[in-house]
C-alpha cells in the first residue's frame, strides 16, 4: 500500500477532499490493485481503536454491577459525534433560511415595492452564499460522522473477536456461527452509514419547529393543515412499512426454502446429472420460486406506494397549507412560493429524516445491546496448574458439558443429604441425578508418571475427547481433582491448518530450532511431501490447507504438536487419515521414540497402540470401564473388544442412557410448531412435547463430543420448581441468511422444509461454534473446484429392525460438514461476502442494459407508457405555473389591503379563484397518474427477474461439468441468492426512483427554460458536467467497492479459521498472534472503505459545487432579465432550488442502478454458459405409454423389443478423459469390454483414476473415444438417454430436502406399492415406517436423521427403481457398519443379478464376487483379467496385495484345514477417509 496523501494534505484539501484526486485519476485510467490503495491513518488502526474501547469497557465492568456498552462508546466518541452534529444542524438551518431570502426577492418585484428592487441583487448574492455555506458545512459533517461510525465498528469488531477467543466451550456450544457473523456484519454495519442520520432525531424536531414558526408568520393557523397532512402521511408510511415487514418475513422463509434446495443442487450437481434429475430439480425449485414471487410482488407494491407517497405528497402539502389562508385573505404569490420552499424542507424532515433517525437509533441500540450481552458471556477459565509436578493425576472427576450442571449437581446432593437426614431415603439422590442428565465423564481416576504413554480407547461418544478437553481446561469438572504441570501440547482429531506456510504451521510461534524442526519433519514422514513442492516448506497453504491431502494435513497438525516443547502431549486420534504403513512408522518414530521422555495421552482404538502403551484407559458411556496395563486388560476384561469397537445396540443401553439419548436427540431434532403432525395417529409415540421442551429445543445445538450425554429437560424438575431453571435468558435461535437485509434491519430466515402433502414432520437445526470446531470437514478438491464436505454419519446400532428410539438416536453421533443451506462454511462464507473480480467491467455496459430491457417485450411498452404519462404531467404543470406566473393583477385602488400589507400582489377577485380549481384538478390528476404510473414498471421488472432466474437455473443444470468445475460453489450460490435478491428487491424500486427523479429534473428544467430561455443556455453545460463527472467517478468508485468487498472476506474467514482451531490456539497460547492477524485484516478493509467514503464525498461535493454555480447563474439571469411581475421569478427560483436536491438524488440513484446492474451482468454471464447437449424433448417415462425405441428405463408395460439397454454389454474404445477442454488427460486410451451381467472390479492406488473412469462412463468429463452399450454408441443418443442407462451409487451421497418419496422418486412415476416393495428389498422399510408420515416424512439438512448407511441404502433403492442394466458403485462400503454392508451385498446379488456391475472399492471382501478386474495405474489400463491370473508372480496386482489379503480372497482354501482361533481385534478409528475430487 502507498502512503496516504491525507497525512500531508492542507486544510483546504481536506475540506474539499482534493487529496483523493490521484486515486480517482488512476482508477479512471487503469484498473486499481490493492497496492494502489492508501494506508490508513494511525487513528483508524484496529490496534488503537480496540485498545481505546477495551480500556473503557474494562472500566465499565469494574465500576458497575450492570455495565453498559453504550457508556464506554460515549466516553470514546461522544464529543466528536456532537461536534459534527452541530455542523450538521447549522447546515440544515441554512435550508430553512433560504426560503426567507427567496420571499424577499419575490417581494422586491411587487410594483408597490420598487424601492426594494435595488437590493434584489444583494438578496440573490445572499441566497447563493447560503448554498455555499451549506455545502461547506454538510459534507465535512456527514463525512466526519461516517468516519466515527467506521471507527466504532472497527473497535467493536475487535472487541467481539477478542471475546470470542475467550469464550468457554459451553458458551460456544450455544452460539451458532451464524450468530457471530450476523453480529459482525448485519449489526455493526449499521454504524457505518447510519450514524449520519442519528442526529436528525433532535435536528428534525428543531427544524420542524423553526419551519412551522416561519410558515405561521406567513399563513397563520392554516400552516398546521400542511403539517397535519405530513404527520398523517408519515403514519401512513409507517403502516406501509409494517405491512412490508410482514410480507418480507413471510417471504424470507420461502426464499430460504428455495436456497436450501438450490444449494443442495449446486453442491451435488455431479450427482444430479448422474441421476438425470435436472428436470425434477428445475421443476422443484421453480415451484418454490413461484410461491416466493407472489410475496415478492406484494412487498414490492407496498414499497412502491410508500415511495410514491413521498414524491407526490408535495402537491397536497402546499395546497392544504395555502388554501385556508387564500380563501380568507386571497392569493399572495410571494407567500405561495415561499411556502412551497418551506414545505419541501418540512416534508423531508417529517417523512424521511426523523423516521430514519428513529429507526437508526432503534437498530443501533438493539445492536449495542446484543453486543453487550455477548461481551458478558462466560469466559474460558484456565485451571490452576502446578509447574513443578511431573505426573498427571485425575481423582474422582465428573463433568457435564451443559452449563450449570455442576451447580445443579451440588444442589441435588445438598437436597439429598437434607432429605436423607429427615426421611432416611438413600436412593433419592440418584433418582434426582438421573433427572439432571447424564454426565459426559463420571468418576474418572488415573495416574501416569513422567515419560509414560496412556492410551485412551472407547466407542464413539464414550468421552475420549471430553477427557482431553478437561485436561486442557476447556471442560470444567463438576467434582474431583486434576493435577498436571500445565505445559500442554495438543493435536486435534480434526486437522486444523491456518493460512500460512507449512513451516509457520509447524513452528506456530514457538522459537525456531533447526535440529528439532528437522527431527519433527522426519518423524512425521513429511520430508518426501515437502520435497515435492518447489517452495519446500515455505509454500503458502490456503485456509484449511485446501491444497493438501487429508493425510498431509493430519501429519502437519501432529508435527505442530510435537514441535512444541511441553510436559504433556494430548493426541486426539491423530492417525485417522493415514494409511496403515505410514501410521505404523509415525507411531514408532514419533510417539514412541522422539517423545519417549514425554508424558503422552493418545486417543486410539488400534490394538498395536494399546500393546505398546504403559497404561490403558477404556471409557464406556462416560465411565472408566478399565484402567491398567494391556496384560491386565486381557485377563480382567476379555469382553473389552465390544466396548472398544462400539458394537452396542441401542437396546443394550441402560435405561438412564436410553432416556438421555432420546431426550438429547429430540432437543436437536426440533419440531416445527405449525407442522401438520397428528401424533394421535401414531401408536408408537414415545415422547410428549411440552411447552418447556418447545422453548428448550430452540436453543439446542448438536455437539458430537458429548452428544449422548447432554441433558434435555422435557418436564420441569423439582429443582426448576424452586427457581433453578437453566438458560432461561438464552437468546432464540438465529441463522445467517443468504438473503441481503433490507434497510429496515436484518432478516433472520426461518428454516422451513419443502412443502408436501400428508402428515409431515418438519425439522430444523443449526450448527454451534463448538460443532464447527469438532466437525470432520472433508476437504477433497479437484484442480479447479473446491467441493463442499460430504456428510458422514456413524450408526450406534444395527441398521435393520430399528425402533423409533433408534431412528432418533442416529442424530447423535453424526460427523457432518457445515452445509450452506443452514450455516455457511469458511469457503462459502468467503464467497458470500464478495464476488470474484472476474471479467465483469467496472462500469455496466450498454449491452447489459439493452439485454435487460429486451428480456420481456412488454418492458419497452411500459417505459413508453411512463414517458407519455410524464409528458402529460409536465403539460399540466406548465398550465398551472403559467397561470400563477401570469395571473392578472388586481388594480391597486380596488385593493382592500393597506399599504403596510402590500408586500406582494393579492388576488381576491372571485373570478381568479379558477386558479385553485385548476390546481386541485391538476393535483388530483397528478396524484392518480403518479401513484399508478410506476406500478406496471415494478410489476414488469419482477417478471424480468423471474425470467432471468429461470434461464440461469436451466443454464446451470444444463452446463457441462468442465464449465462448472471452473466455478466455485459459493459463487454459483451467490447468483441465486444475493444477485436474484437484488433483481427482486432493490433493482425495480431503484430503477423506478431513478426514472422518477430524472423525469422530475427534466420537467423542471423544461419549465424553467420555457419561462426564461436564457437559463436553458446555462443548463446545457451543467448537464454535460454532471455526465462527465459521473463517468469519471464511477470508474473508480466501482473498483473501490469491489476491493472493499474483497477486503471484507478475510475478516470473516479469519474468524471461522480461529474458531475451528480455538482449542489449538488456547493450548499453544497464540491468541495475541491471531488478534494481530485479525487487526491486519480489519486494517486492510478499513483502507478500502475509508478511501471509498472519501472519494464518494469528493463526488458529492463536486455535484453541489456545480449546482451552486448553476444556481448563481439562474439567480442573476432571472433577477436581471425579469421585468415586472413576481410570478415568473418565483417559479424560476423555486424550481431551481428543487432541481438542486432532486438532481443530486438522481445522479446518486444512477450510480446505484449501475452498481445493481452488475448483478444483472453476472446473471447474464451464467445464462450464456455452454450446454452439455442440444435441447431435446423430455425422456421422462410414463407408466402406461409407449416410448421410442431408444428406451432407458425398463417398463413392464413395454415390449422387450423396445427396451434399451437389454443386456448391459459395454464396449470401451480408446477412451480419453479430461477435466477441462484442452487440459491434461486424466485417463488415456482406455479400451476393454464387459459382457452382459458381468461384475467388474476397478483396482488401483489412490488417485489412479478409478472414480474418474466412472465419471467418464456418464459423460461428466470431456471425453474422446467411444463407448457402446448393447451396440448403441453414446454419440447417437442424447445425454439424458445415455445416463439413464446407468444406476449409480456415488461416493458422495445426495439426499435433498424433501420427503422420502421425493428423494426416491423425484419424477413421481412409481406408486407407493412399488416404492414400498423396493424399500423392502434394500432394508429401508423398517427405517421409514418409524418416522411420522412414513414416505411423507420430510428430510432436511442432507438427511441429518439418517446414518450414512441409511443414505447409501437410499441410493441403492433409487438404482433399483430405475431398473437400470448397468450399475456403477463408487466406494459404496465407505463408513458402513457391517449390517448395512451385508444388506448392500445381498441386494446386489438379488436385485441386480442380471445386471452389469462396475465396482470401485477398497475392501478386498467386496471384490470377491467380481468375475473380472480392471487394474488402473498412471491413468492407463495395466491389466484386465480374472483374479486368478492377476495373482501370478509377474502381476502388478500381486505386488500391491499383502499375503493376508490373498488369504481373504480365497478363504475356502484354509477353512477346512484348521479352525481359526478367536482373536481380539479392534475396529478402525471412526474417521472420514479422504474423498477424492473425481468422486461421483
Curated annotation (Swiss-Prot):
Pfam family, one: ABC_membrane
One Gene Ontology term, aspect cellular component: apical plasma membrane
The species this protein was found in: Gorilla gorilla gorilla (Western lowland gorilla)
CDD domains: ABC_6TM_CFTR_D1 (cd18594), ABC_6TM_CFTR_D2 (cd18600), ABCC_CFTR1 (cd03291), ABCC_CFTR2 (cd03289)
Protein biosynthesis is among the record's keywords: no
Region described as Disordered R region: 654-831
Lineage: Eukaryota, Metazoa, Chordata, Craniata, Vertebrata
Cross-linked sites for Glycyl lysine isopeptide (Lys-Gly) (interchain with G-Cter in ubiquitin): 688
Modified how: N-glycosylated.
Membrane topology: Multi-pass membrane protein
Cytoplasmic membrane side: 1-77, 147-195, 244-298, 359-858, 940-990, 1035-1095, 1152-1480
UniProt keyword Phosphoprotein, yes or no: yes
Modification type Phosphoserine: residues: 549, 660, 670, 686, 700, 712, 737, 753, 768, 790, 795, 813, 1444, 1456
Compartments, as annotated in UniProt: Apical cell membrane; Early endosome membrane; Cell membrane; Recycling endosome membrane
Ranges of the Extracellular topological domain: 99-122, 217-222, 320-339, 880-918, 1012-1013, 1117-1130
Residue ranges annotated for the ABC transmembrane type-1 domain, each copy included: 81-365, 859-1155
One GO BP annotation of this record: response to endoplasmic reticulum stress
Binding site for ATP 2: 1219, 1244-1251
UniProt family annotation: Belongs to the ABC transporter superfamily. ABCC family. CFTR transporter (TC 3.A.1.202) subfamily.
UniProt enzyme class: isomerase
Name of protein: Cystic fibrosis transmembrane conductance regulator
Summary of the function given for this chain in its UniProt record: Epithelial ion channel that plays an important role in the regulation of epithelial ion and water transport and fluid homeostasis. Mediates the transport of chloride ions across the cell membrane. Possesses an intrinsic ATPase activity and utilizes ATP to gate its channel; the passive flow of anions through the channel is gated by cycles of ATP binding and hydrolysis by the ATP-binding domains. The ion channel is also permeable to HCO(3)(-); selectivity depends on the extracellular chloride concentration.
Reaction(s) catalysed by this chain's protein: ATP + H2O + closed Cl(-) channel = ADP + phosphate + open Cl(-) channel; chloride(in) = chloride(out); hydrogencarbonate(in) = hydrogencarbonate(out); ATP + H2O = ADP + phosphate + H(+)
Enzyme Commission number, as recorded: 5.6.1.6
Glycan attachment sites: 894, 900
Binding site for ATP 1: 401, 434, 458-465, 493
Amino acid at each position: 500500500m502507498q502512503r496516504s496523501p491525507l497525512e500531508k494534505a492542507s486544510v483546504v484539501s481536506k475540506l474539499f477532499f482534493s487529496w483523493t484526486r490521484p486515486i480517482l485519476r488512476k482508477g479512471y485510467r487503469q484498473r486499481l490493485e490493492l497496492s494502489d490503495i492508501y494506508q490508513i491513518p494511525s487513528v483508524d488502526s484496529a490496534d488503537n481503536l480496540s485498545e481505546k474501547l477495551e480500556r473503557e469497557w474494562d472500566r465499565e465492568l469494574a465500576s458497575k454491577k450492570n455495565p453498559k456498552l453504550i457508556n464506554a462508546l460515549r466516553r470514546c466518541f461522544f464529543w466528536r459525534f456532537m461536534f459534527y452534529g452541530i455542523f450538521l444542524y447549522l447546515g440544515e438551518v441554512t435550508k430553512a433560511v433560504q426560503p426567507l431570502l427567496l420571499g424577499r426577492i419575490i417581494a422586491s418585484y411587487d410594483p408597490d415595492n420598487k424601492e426594494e428592487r435595488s437590493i434584489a441583487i444583494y438578496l440573490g448574492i445572499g441566497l447563493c452564499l447560503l448554498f455555499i455555506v451549506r455545502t461547506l458545512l454538510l459534507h465535512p459533517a456527514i463525512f466526519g460522522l461516517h468516519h466515527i461510525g467506521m471507527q466504532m465498528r472497527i473497535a467493536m469488531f475487535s472487541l467481539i473477536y477478542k471475546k470470542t477467543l475467550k469464550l468457554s466451550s459451553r458458551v460456544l456450544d450455544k452460539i451458532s456461527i451464524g450468530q457471530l457473523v450476523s453480529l459482525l456484519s448485519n449489526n455493526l454495519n449499521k454504524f457505518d452509514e447510519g450514524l449520519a442520520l442519528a442526529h436528525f432525531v433532535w435536528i428534525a424536531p428543531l427544524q420542524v419547529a423553526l419551519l412551522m414558526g416561519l410558515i405561521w408568520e406567513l399563513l397563520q393557523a392554516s400552516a398546521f393543515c400542511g403539517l397535519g397532512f405530513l404527520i398523517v402521511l408519515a403514519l401512513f408510511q409507517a403502516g406501509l412499512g409494517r405491512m412490508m415487514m410482514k410480507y418480507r418475513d413471510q417471504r424470507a422463509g420461502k426464499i430460504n426454502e428455495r436456497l436450501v434446495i438450490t444449494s443442495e443442487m449446486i453442491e451435488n450437481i455431479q450427482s444430479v446429472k448422474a441421476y438425470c434429475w435436472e428436470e425434477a430439480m428445475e421443476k422443484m425449485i421453480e415451484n418454490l420460486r413461484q410461491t416466493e414471487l407472489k410475496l415478492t410482488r406484494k412487498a414490492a407494491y407496498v414499497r412502491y406506494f410508500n415511495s410514491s407517497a413521498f414524491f407526490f405528497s408535495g402537491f397536497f402539502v402546499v395546497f392544504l397549507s395555502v388554501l385556508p389562508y387564500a380563501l380568507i385573505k386571497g392569493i399572495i404569490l410571494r407567500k405561495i412560493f415561499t411556502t412551497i420552499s418551506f414545505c419541501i424542507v418540512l416534508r423531508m424532515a417529517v417523512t424521511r429524516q426523523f423516521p430514519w433517525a428513529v429507526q437508526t437509533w432503534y437498530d443501533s441500540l438493539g445492536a449495542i445491546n446484543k453486543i453487550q450481552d455477548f461481551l458478558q458471556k462466560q469466559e474460558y477459565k484456565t485451571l490452576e496448574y502446578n509447574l513443578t509436578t511431573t505426573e498427571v493425576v485425575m481423582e474422582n472427576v465428573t463433568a457435564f458439558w451443559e452449563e450449570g450442571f455442576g451447580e445443579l449437581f451440588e444442589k441435588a446432593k445438598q437436597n439429598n443429604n437434607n432429605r436423607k437426614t429427615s426421611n432416611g431415603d438413600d436412593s433419592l439422590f440418584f433418582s434426582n441425578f438421573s433427572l439432571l442428565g447424564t454426565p459426559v465423564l463420571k468418576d474418572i481416576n488415573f495416574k501416569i508418571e513422567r515419560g509414560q504413554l496412556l492410551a485412551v480407547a472407547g466407542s464413539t461418544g464414550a468421552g475420549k475427547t471430553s477427557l482431553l478437553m478437561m485436561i486442557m481446561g476447556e471442560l470444567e469438572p463438576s467434582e474431583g481433582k486434576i493435577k498436571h504441570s500445565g505445559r500442554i501440547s495438543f493435536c486435534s482429531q480434526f486437522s486444523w491448518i491456518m493460512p500460512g506456510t507449512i513451516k509457520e504451521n509447524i513452528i506456530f510461534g514457538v522459537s525456531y530450532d533447526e535440529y528439532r524442526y528437522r527431527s519433527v519433519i522426519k518423524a512425521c514422514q513429511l520430508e518426501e511431501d515437502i520435497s515435492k513442492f518447489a517452495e519446500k516448506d515455505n509454500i503458502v497453504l490456503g485456509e484449511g490447507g485446501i491444497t493438501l491431502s487429508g493425510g498431509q494435513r493430519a501429519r502437519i497438525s501432529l508435527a505442530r504438536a510435537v514441535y512444541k516443547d511441553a510436559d504433556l502431549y494430548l493426541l486426539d486420534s491423530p492417525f485417522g487419515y493415514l494409511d496403515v504403513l505410514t501410521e505404523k512408522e509415525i507411531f514408532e518414530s514419533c510417539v514412541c521414540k522422539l517423545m519417549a521422555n514425554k508424558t503422552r495421552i493418545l486417543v486410539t482404538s488400534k490394538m498395536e497402540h494399546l500393546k505398546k502403551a504403559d497404561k490403558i484407559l477404556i471409557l464406556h458411556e462416560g465411565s472408566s470401564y478399565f484402567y491398567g496395563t494391556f496384560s491386565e486388560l486381557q485377563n480382567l476384561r476379555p469382553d473389552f473388544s465390544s466396548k472398544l469397537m462400539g458394537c452396542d445396540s441401542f437396546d443394550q443401553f441402560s435405561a438412564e442412557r436410553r432416556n438421555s439419548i432420546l431426550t438429547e436427540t429430540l432437543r436437536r431434532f426440533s419440531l416445527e410448531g405449525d407442522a401438520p403432525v397428528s401424533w394421535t395417529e401414531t401408536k408408537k409415540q414415545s415422547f410428549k412435547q411440552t411447552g418447556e421442551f418447545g422453548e428448550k429445543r430452540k436453543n439446542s445445538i448438536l455437539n458430537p463430543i458429548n452428544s449422548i450425554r447432554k441433558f434435555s429437560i422435557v418436564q420441569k424438575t423439582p429443582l426448576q420448581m424452586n427457581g433453578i431453571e437453566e438458560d432461561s435468558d438464552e437468546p432464540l435461535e438465529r441463522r445467517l441468511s443468504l438473503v441481503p437485509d433490507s434497510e429496515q434491519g436484518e432478516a433472520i430466515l426461518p428454516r422451513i422444509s419443502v412443502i408436501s402433502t400428508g402428515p409431515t414432520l418438519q425439522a430444523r437445526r443449526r450448527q454451534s461454534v463448538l460443532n464447527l470446531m469438532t466437525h470432520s470437514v472433508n476437504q477433497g478438491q479437484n484442480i479447479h473446484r473446491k467441493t463442499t464436505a460430504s456428510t458422514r454419519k456413524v450408526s450406534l446400532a444395527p441398521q435393520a429392525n430399528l425402533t423409533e428410539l433408534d431412528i432418533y438416536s442416529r442424530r447423535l453421533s453424526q460427523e457432518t460438514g457445515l452445509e450452506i443451506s443452514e450455516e455457511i462454511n469458511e469457503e462459502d462464507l468467503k464467497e458470500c461476502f464478495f464476488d470474484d473480480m472476474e471479467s465483469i467491467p467496472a462500469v455496466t455496459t450498454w449491452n447489459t442494459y439493452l439485454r435487460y430491457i429486451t428480456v420481456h417485450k412488454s418492458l419497452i411498452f411500459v417505459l413508453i407508457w411512463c414517458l407519455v404519462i410524464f409528458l402529460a404531467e409536465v403539460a399540466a404543470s406548465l398550465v398551472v405555473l403559467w397561470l400563477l406566473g401570469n395571473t392578472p393583477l388586481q388594480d391597486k385602488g380596488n385593493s382592500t389591503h393597506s399599504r403596510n400589507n402590500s408586500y406582494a400582489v393579492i388576488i381576491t377577485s372571485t373570478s381568479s379563484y379558477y386558479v385553485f380549481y385548476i390546481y386541485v384538478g391538476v393535483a388530483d390528476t397528478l396524484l392518480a397518474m403518479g401513484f399508478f404510473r410506476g406500478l406496471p414498471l415494478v410489476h414488469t421488472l419482477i417478471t424480468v427477474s423471474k425470467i432471468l432466474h429461470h434461464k440461469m437455473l436451466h443454464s446451470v443444470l444444463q452446463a457441462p461439468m468442465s464449465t462448472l468445475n471452473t466455478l466455485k460453489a459459493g459463487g454459483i450460490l451467490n447468483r441465486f441468492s444475493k444477485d436474484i435478491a437484488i433483481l427482486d428487491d432493490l433493482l425495480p424500486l431503484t430503477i423506478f426512483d431513478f426514472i422518477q427523479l430524472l423525469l422530475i429534473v427534466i420537467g423542471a428544467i423544461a419549465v424553467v427554460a420555457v419561462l426564461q430561455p436564457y437559463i436553458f443556455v446555462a443548463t446545457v453545460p451543467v448537464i454535460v458536467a454532471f455526465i462527465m463527472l459521473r463517468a469519471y467517478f464511477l470508474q473508480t468508485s466501482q473498483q473501490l467497492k469491489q476491493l472493499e468487498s474483497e477486503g471484507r472476506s478475510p475478516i470473516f474467514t479469519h474468524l471461522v479459521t480461529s474458531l475451528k482451531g480455538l482449542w489449538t490456539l488456547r493450548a499453544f497460547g497464540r491468541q495475541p498472534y491471531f488478534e494481530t492477524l485479525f487487526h491486519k485484516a480489519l486494517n486492510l478493509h478499513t483502507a478500502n472503505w475509508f478511501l471509498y467514503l472519501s472519494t464518494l464525498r469528493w463526488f458529492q461535493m463536486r455535484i453541489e459545487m456545480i449546482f451552486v454555480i448553476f444556481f448563481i447563474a439562474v439567480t442573476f439571469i432571472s433577477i436581471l432579465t425579469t421585468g415586472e411581475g413576481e410570478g415568473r421569478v418565483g417559479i424560476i427560483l423555486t424550481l431551481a432550488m428543487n432541481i438542486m436536491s432532486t438532481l443530486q438524488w438522481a445522479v446518486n440513484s444512477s450510480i446505484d442502478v449501475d452498481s445493481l446492474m452488475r448483478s444483472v451482468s453476472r446473471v447474464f454471464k451464467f445464462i450464456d454458459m455452454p450446454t452439455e447437449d442440444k435441447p431435446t424433448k423430455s425422456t421422462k417415462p410414463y407408466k402406461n405409454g409407449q416410448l421410442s425405441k431408444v428406451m432407458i428405463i425398463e417398463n413392464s408395460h413395454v415390449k422387450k423389443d423396445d427396451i434399451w439397454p437389454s443386456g448391459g454389454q459395454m464396449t470401451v474404445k480408446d477412451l480419453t478423459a479430461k477435466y477441462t477442454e484442452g487440459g491434461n488427460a486424466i485417463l488415456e486410451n482406455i479400451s476393454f469390454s464387459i459382457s452382459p451381467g458381468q461384475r467388474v472390479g476397478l483396482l488401483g492406488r489412490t488417485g489412479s483414476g478409478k472414480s474418474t473412469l466412472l465419471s467418464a462412463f456418464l459423460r461428466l468429463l470431456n471425453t474422446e473415444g467411444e463407448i457402446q452399450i448393447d451396440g448403441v454408441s453414446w454419440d447417437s443418443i442424447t445425454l439424458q438417454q445415455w445416463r439413464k442407462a446407468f444406476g449409480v451409487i456415488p461416493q458422495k451421497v445426495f439426499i435433498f430436502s424433501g420427503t422420502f418419496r421425493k428423494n426416491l422418486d423425484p419424477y413421481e412415476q412409481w406408486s407407493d406399492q412399488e416404492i414400498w416393495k423396493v424399500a423392502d428389498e434394500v432394508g429401508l422399510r423398517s427405517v421409514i415406517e418409524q418416522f411420522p408420515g412414513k414416505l411423507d416424512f420430510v428430510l432436511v439438512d442432507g438427511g441429518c436423521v439418517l446414518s450414512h448407511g441409511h443414505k447409501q441404502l437410499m441410493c441403492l433403492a433409487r438404482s433399483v427403481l430405475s431398473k437400470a442394466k448397468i450399475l456403477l458403485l463408487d466406494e459404496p462400503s465407505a463408513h458402513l457398519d457391517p449390517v448395512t454392508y451385508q444388506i448392500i451385498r445381498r441386494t446386489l446379488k438379488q436385485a441386480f443379478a442380471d445386471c452389469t456391475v462396475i465396482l470401485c472399492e477398497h475392501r478386498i471382501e467386496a471384490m470377491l464376487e467380481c468375475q473380472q478386474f480392471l487394474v488402473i495405474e498412471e491413468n492407463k489400463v495395466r491389466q484386465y483379467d480374472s483374479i486368478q491370473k492377476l495373482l501370478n508372480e509377474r502381476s502388478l496386482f500381486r505386488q500391491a496385495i499383502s499375503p493376508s489379503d490373498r488369504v481373504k480372497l480365497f478363504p475356502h482354501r484354509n477353512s477346512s484345514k484348521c479352525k481359526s482361533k478367536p482373536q481380539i481385534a479392534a475396529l478402525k478409528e471412526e474417521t472420514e477417509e479422504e474423498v477424492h475430487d473425481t468422486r461421483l
